[in-house]
Curated annotation (Swiss-Prot):
Keywords: Ribonucleoprotein, Ribosomal protein, RNA-binding, rRNA-binding. The gene is rplF. One of its GO terms (biological process) is cytoplasmic translation. It comes from Halothermothrix orenii (strain H 168 / OCM 544 / DSM 9562). Signal peptide: none annotated. GO terms for molecular function: rRNA binding; structural constituent of ribosome. This protein binds to the 23S rRNA, and is important in its secondary structure. It is located near the subunit interface in the base of the L7/L12 stalk, and near the tRNA binding site of the peptidyltransferase center. Part of the 50S ribosomal subunit. It comes from the Bacteria. Gene3D superfamilies: Ribosomal protein L6, alpha-beta domain. This is Large ribosomal subunit protein uL6. Belongs to the universal ribosomal protein uL6 family.
């Protein structure tokens, strides 16, 4: 039995969840998210202020996995429209700077030109102290992808530790050549 999948998702007071066939729409104070679940192995229903995800066939192993996945995605949608999500990144290196230009993010990370990252719909960048970047949004997956895109501009290198890293991320350091 899927332990996560059998738990109901509680719907807070200010959040409205509606299910039409395979389309789940979650509206809340921060915005609206819609996701399509094309899996015929699970059903989604709203009952008594809770979202229930049920399997169509109890013996199916794939259905157990999809039940847990679907429940987790719906829980993230509810969390996103109530509180939102954020990922923090920090820049380590001499002369590494970040600036906000309108909605977009401009990074100076040792290249001959500044790198501009355009904010997608639903994503907001904040810059603190020129070297800390905060990526905010209501869609957990989209926030994670944008943070990964920012990090990919200059990944942390193992010799000096320079680059863009997630806050609290530990970079394994290597010894340089001796001799």
């Amino acid at each position: 039995m899927s332990r996560i999948g059998k738990l109901p998702v509680d719907i807070p007071e200010k959040v409205d969840v509606s299910v039409n066939d395979n389309l789940v729409t979650v509206k809340g104070p921060k915005g609206e998210l819609t996701k399509e679940f094309n899996n015929k192995k699970v059903t989604v229903e709203v009952k008594d202020g809770q979202v229930l995800v049920r399997r169509v066939h109890d013996k199916d192993k794939d259905a157990r996995a999809f039940q847990g996945l679907t429940r987790s995605l719906i829980d993230s949608m509810v969390e996103g429209v109530t509180n939102g999500f954020e990922k923090k990144l920090e820049m380590v290196g001499v002369g590494y700077n970040a600036k906000k230009k309108g909605k977009d993010l401009e990074l100076e990370v040792g290249y001959s030109h500044p790198v501009i990252i355009e904010a997608e719909d639903g994503i907001e960048f904040d810059v603190e102290k020129n070297n800390k970047i905060v990526v905010r949004g209501i869609d957990k997956q989209q926030v994670g992808e944008m943070a990964a895109k920012v990090r990919a501009v200059r990944k942390p290198e193992p010799y000096k530790g320079k680059g863009i890293r997630y806050e609290g991320e530990h970079i394994r350091r290597k010894e340089g050549k001796t001799g």
